[in-house]
Amino acid sequence: MNKLKQIDELLKKGHSLHEAGINNWAFLKKDALEVLNRFEELNVFILGGDVYVLSYDFFQPNYDDWYCNRFSNETDIEFLKRSIKIAKEFIMNYNIAYTEASQILLLSY
């Protein structure tokens, strides 16, 4: 299976936000971490992400986010590792009060 198909399969684990006009996917915390592990294997950079909360059947931003800019002297591998590390640290350390109702919008890649 090629890389794009593998990415598409991973994204299906999340909730598409396309109907809300957002070209991205929301994942539960544990699923987001699993996707990050697989993205690292596929060499997919993570540029950042946002936290969305499911409220009354609608995803709403809570305006918490993270980002990772590439350094000018960074190799692809260095940036990959650092971008995944920053994403994982944010997600693992993020305190979600309502775990089942909260989603982390992950992928700006």
Segments from the language model and where they lie:
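Structured alpha/beta or helical-core interaction and ligand-binding surfaces enriched in interleaved
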Residues: 22, 29-35, 41, 47, ...
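Long, contiguous N-terminal structural blocks used for assembly/anchoring
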Residues: 1-27
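Short secondary-structure junctions
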Residues: 39-45, 96-99
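Acidic, low-complexity, intrinsically disordered interaction modules
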Residues: 44-89
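Exposed alpha-helical structural elements
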Residues: 6, 31-34, 86
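Ordered hydrophobic segments in well-structured contexts
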Residues: 26, 45-53, 103-108
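Short coil/turn linker and secondary-structure boundary residues
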Residues: 2, 27-30, 74, 82
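Amphipathic alpha-helical binding modules
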Residues: 77-109
